[in-house]
């Protein structure tokens, strides 16, 4: 962990992978998840998507919530396995109900876009809102968009602005872009031209 994030030592992915690997044979969920993540992204080791997927599966079977969400992403993008939106939805749903913030957002996105299910804007908004409560910037931005265009919730420009501002002030670049565009499209707000240029 310390080598992964460079806490009190120089950041060293190879050393971090080596140390995490010590717990893999013991079946430690955190070790399985961390080495899977390194293998997926090629951190300190040659990228191996298939092996990453297998380790995520093992960690998920042991109840590791982030691994359950990661399996959803593997199925969503076809990384280390075939692309399968319905399987992705299954894992996102499982992880979301266990409190995983990213899975809550992903579940909202799937309902929003109709991936592996029928489009359901109300459910999409619900899950965006749940992820936003956890402080996830992308979910806060998605909520703002729902309010701006009336997707799954009654249209409310003031609330859209409030949520765009919240996410933008957290440093989320997509929210900053959306906020600039929002001001450009809504000239009724004070100093909208100036604010549009700023964001």
Give the residues covered by each predicted segment.
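Residue-level recognition of tetratricopeptide repeat
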Residues: 28, 64-66, 100, 136-138, ...
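Ankyrin-repeat and related helical/solenoid repeat scaffolds used for protein-protein interactions
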Residues: 148, 158, 165, 170-198
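Short, low-complexity interaction segments enriched in Ser/Thr/Pro/Gly
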Residues: 12, 27, 91, 101-103, ...
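Short coil/turn and helix-start
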Residues: 5-11, 25, 43-47, 61, ...
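Hydrophobic face of amphipathic alpha-helices that form TPR/SEL1-like repeat modules
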Residues: 1-5, 19, 32-41, 68-77, ...
């Amino acid at each position: 962990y310390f080598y992964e994030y460079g806490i009190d030592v120089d950041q060293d992915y190879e050393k971090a992978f080596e140390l995490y690997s010590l717990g893999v044979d013991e079946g430690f969920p955190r070790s399985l998840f961390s080495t899977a993540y390194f293998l997926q992204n090629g951190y300190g080791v040659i990228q191996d998507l298939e092996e990453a997927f297998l380790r995520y599966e093992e960690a998920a079977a042991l109840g590791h919530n982030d691994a359950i969400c990661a399996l959803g992403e593997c199925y969503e993008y076809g990384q280390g396995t075939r692309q399968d939106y319905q399987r992705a939805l299954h894992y996102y749903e499982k992880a979301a109900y266990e409190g995983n913030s990213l899975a809550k957002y992903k579940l909202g996105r799937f309902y929003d876009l109709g991936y592996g299910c029928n489009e359901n804007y109300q459910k999409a908004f619900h899950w965006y809102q749940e992820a936003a409560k956890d402080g996830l910037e992308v979910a806060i931005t998605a909520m703002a968009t729902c309010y701006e265009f009336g997707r799954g919730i009654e249209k409310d420009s003031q609330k859209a602005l409030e949520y765009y501002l919240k996410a933008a002030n957290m440093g989320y670049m997509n929210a900053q872009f959306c906020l600039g565009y929002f001001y450009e499209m809504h000239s009724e707000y004070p100093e909208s031209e100036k604010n549009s240029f700023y964001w």
